[in-house]
Design a protein with these regions (language model features):
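Internal alpha-helical scaffold of NAD(P)-dependent oxidoreductase catalytic cores
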Residues: 144-220, 224-258
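Rossmann-like NAD(P)-binding element
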Residues: 53-95, 100-103
Length: 360
């Protein structure tokens, strides 16, 4: 199968390596402002990996020419933070062809709909099937351009939904060889809500701001950054997320329970579960507060949850407090920026029942 991977960061290189390891012909694309891994993969002819997946896997092409990456592609993975989805969609728009599958990996806030909007596709358009995953399939870090370390490949708790959801089974069948543990979600509201990053990352970062600024992230983010008090904040945010899911008729698995299913954690608790987690061992904190744990997971993820809660009548006082505090720390108005909400996706006028019907 011919696979195009858009995004050459941690996740993109992880997806490209794994797909190539399963015998697929992989092309890697990124924008010109991100040349590091593209140049390295061009020079080396592929991607090197260490960790639970090891070795070297060839990549057919790596470059900044989107038409070359998409030509003949059966599956297109858009892999990057939430703010990459719209640019990926817009650059793909003239080159997408009928029958292709696009998977936004991961989506924390309606990434599949954001891609459809950016690519000029109708919500119910099935000529090009667009889907999203609930999270990245790996804990992965770039060691250097073109060289990655995969700490964990999810053993379960990885969900996928297409728009409309009736195409979910078809997409799963196409990716089953690489992701055998991937499961069908009810719809993209479930995949969007099941992403735990907005629950975990902002809380841990917020409670460790002094340590991050003082040490430039020279500590283990999960093993050293989580204490019982930090765990209580994570749990409070998680409760509000789960309540939104209940109102929308979708099951949201509590984050520690999901962490055990995925193979990150050995126990389903909000404190020691992270502190002793085998899948997070060795993962360092970010070197700066100006990082996706605030800019994406608050600016997109938590703002999306807060606005969605408002829409369906679920109070989110803890989520709102985290947004307010982080906005003050970063001298930004994340709520006012409203980078991605149900309104920006074109879905703010619908009730919970109407959304369920619309996305089915």
């Amino acid at each position: 199968m011919n696979i195009a991977v858009l995004g050459s960061g941690n996740g993109g290189c992880g997806v490209a390596f794994d797909c190539a390891a399963h015998g697929h012909q992989v092309s890697l694309f990124d924008f010109k402002q991100f040349p590091g891994s593209i140049r390295a993969v061009q020079h080396n002819g592929g991607i090197r990996c260490e960790g639970i997946l090891e070795g070297f896997q060839p990549v057919v092409s790596a470059g900044h020419e989107i038409e070359k990456a998409l030509d003949g592609a059966d599956i297109i993975y858009a892999v990057g933070p939430a703010y990459s989805t719209r640019p990926f969609a817009e650059v793909c728009k003239p080159h997408l062809t009928q029958g292709q599958i696009v998977i936004v990996c991961p989506s924390s806030c309606g990434g599949s709909i954001e891609f459809k909007n950016g690519a000029g596709l109708n919500l119910r358009d099935e000529g090009i099937v667009v889907a999203e995953t609930s999270t990245l399939p790996y804990a992965v870090r770039l060691l250097e351009p073109g060289n990655i370390k995969i700490f964990n490949k999810l053993k379960g708790g990885l969900f996928l939904a297409a728009v409309p959801a009736k195409n979910t089974k078809y997409v799963l069948e196409q990716v089953r060889d690489v992701y055998p543990s991937m499961s069908a979600a009810k719809n993209i509201l479930q995949t969007s809500l099941q992403n735990g990053n907005p629950v975990i990352h902002p809380a841990i970062t917020l409670m460790n701001v002094a340590l991050i600024e003082r040490t430039k992230g020279d500590f283990e983010f999960y093993h050293e950054g989580v204490t019982p008090a930090v765990g209580r904040l994570i749990e409070a945010v998680d409760r509000e997320r789960i309540a939104i899911g209940e109102k929308l008729g979708v099951e949201v698995i509590p984050d520690p329970k999901l962490g055990v299913i995925q193979g990150y954690m050995a126990e389903a608790t909000y404190d020691t579960g992270f502190i002793t987690s085998p899948g997070f061992a060795g993962v360092k904190a970010q070197s700066s507060l100006d990082y996706r744990y605030f800019n994406e997971d608050v600016g997109y993820g938590l703002v999306f949850l807060q606005k969605l809660g408002e829409q369906v009548g679920v109070a989110t006082p803890v989520i709102s407090a985290v947004i307010t505090l982080v906005s003050q720390l970063m001298n930004r108005d994340y709520l006012g920026e409203a980078r991605r909400t149900m309104e920006t996706l074109g879905l703010s006028k619908h009730t919970a029942e109407e959304l369920e019907t619309l996305l089915a």
